Amino acid sequence: LMKTGLFNKVTMTIQPENSDNPNVRDLLVEVDESQTGSLNFGLMAGSDSGLIGNISLSQRNFDVADWPESWSEFWQRKAFVGAGQQFSMEFQPGDEVFNYGASLTDPRFLDSDYSLGGSVGWMSRDYNDYRQETLYSKVSVGRKFGDIWYGRLSLSADRIKLTHFDDNVPVEIFNDQGPSTINSLGISVSRTTLAPYTRPTEGSRINMSIDQYGVPSGDYTFTKTYISTTSYFAIDRDFLHRTYALRLDSKIGYIFGGESPTFEKFYLGGRSFRGFDYRSISPKGTPRVAGGDPDVSIGGDWEFYLGAQYEFPVLDKFISMVVFCDSGTVVDKPSFDEYRVSVGTGIRLYIPQLGQAPLAFDFGFPIVKEETDKKKI
């Protein structure tokens, strides 16, 4: 019930034995319903995406069939609520990223164990040497298996165009300018045992996916596989019941069975590999013009990553420090060539008014790198 996000508190009490049926006990469930709808205005800043404004409307207890009977019912927020569906709309203008989209998901479609969801939107992303514009849509069907396993089948249809090239754009990216139709059919499986669910210190999360591109049609045909794991270990607890936790991460991705465009390949760097510039860990392209930059990343078909992070409290439950080590590579074929390693430290600020995710400030320093790598502390 807590994982639905619809309740602040859930209390379960086993009722006294009934003499008429001594082998059965009733269970009293008391819930404190949370505020499920929100209209948010915000400003986000990140090392990978620049400055982004955010205007979002969300409802975690949406009902697409509950149409208002009057305008007053609509403005009093008594319509479109009550079925447990999840609806959101976002408008995100930024200096590097511009996105607007909408999504609707029914986690228990027709009161079954299956979920049904869809999303549509448009996004523009400015890279150093070009711009990528994506018109995207996705439909997915999912199902829970027990308490920890979840499977999903999804169909995606995207229209991608690369524009605003400068002289440093390599041949490989320029040839992918499109517009390109990118369709895919994907299957994903996840297993989650994180505890507690919102700020885990124990348990693990495993995600596995395989996507076949070119289904039912499209400009590219290839297969993309990906596996990621995250594990938490509670190392110690102090007298204030604060936890010292170790986090281990791994990622393996492989593209095969055809030629993939540069915008679907793997990259590491920035938040995904601290101490290196965003998307800088990757094979480099061929300069398109004389004097062009020979060190522009074009992505690889093989990604391997291992990371470790130790987090310990500093001030109550609101401020903590981390030390970390990131390692991995992105190349064209499965191997450990051009392997990089970085170490660093950071701070986490947990501010409940800003959501469950902390403000993160990390400082990474490469200790194993290639000559052409671009560092970013």
Q: How would you label these PLM feature ranges?
A:
Residues 1-46, 69-97, 101-106, 132, ...:
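Periplasmic polypeptide-binding modules associated with outer-membrane biogenesis and secretion
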Residues 3, 34, 48, 80-81, ...:
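Edge/loop elements at the starts and ends of beta-strands within beta-rich repeat scaffolds
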Residues 7-10, 37-39, 50, 61-68, ...:
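Repeated loop/turn-to-beta-strand initiation elements of outer-membrane beta-barrel proteins
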Residues 18-27, 37-50, 56-58, 154-156, ...:
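C-terminal outer-membrane beta-barrel translocator/porin domains of Gram-negative envelope proteins
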Residues 57, 186, 344-354, 374-377:
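Outer-membrane beta-barrel "beta-signal"
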Residues 93-177:
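Transmembrane beta-barrel wall of Gram-negative outer-membrane proteins
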Residues 121, 321-330, 338-342, 364-365:
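Active/binding-pocket-proximal capping segment
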Residues 127, 365-374:
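Class II aminoacyl-tRNA synthetase catalytic cores and aaRS-like
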